[in-house]
Swiss-Prot record:
Keywords: Disulfide bond, Enterotoxin, Secreted, Signal, Toxin, Virulence. This is Heat-stable enterotoxin II. Gene3D superfamilies: Heat-stable enterotoxin B (1.20.10.10). Residues 1-23 form the signal peptide. Disulfide bonds join C33-C71, C44-C59.
């Protein structure tokens, strides 16, 4: 159980860094929010194994990033 939680947190951390690097080139907040939403959609559609393949963490991390950016 601890291993799954650690993996989930690591996935969220890595995804948030990747999301920031991808979306940082956008200058318009509307465009930035649209890119964050698209990334969230793509990451939530990937995979089917949940925590074991990291998609649950990526999906959760993407949703948090969209909310954190005020979109």
């Amino acid at each position: 159980m601890k291993k799954n939680i650690a993996f989930l947190l690591a996935s969220m951390f890595v995804f948030s860094i990747a999301t920031n690097a991808y979306a940082s080139t956008q200058s318009n907040k509307k465009d930035l929010c649209e890119h964050y939403r698209q990334i969230a959609k793509e990451s939530c559609k990937k995979g089917f194994l949940g925590v074991r393949d990291g998609t649950a963490g990526a999906c959760f991390g993407a949703q948090i990033m969209v909310a954190a950016k005020g979109c």
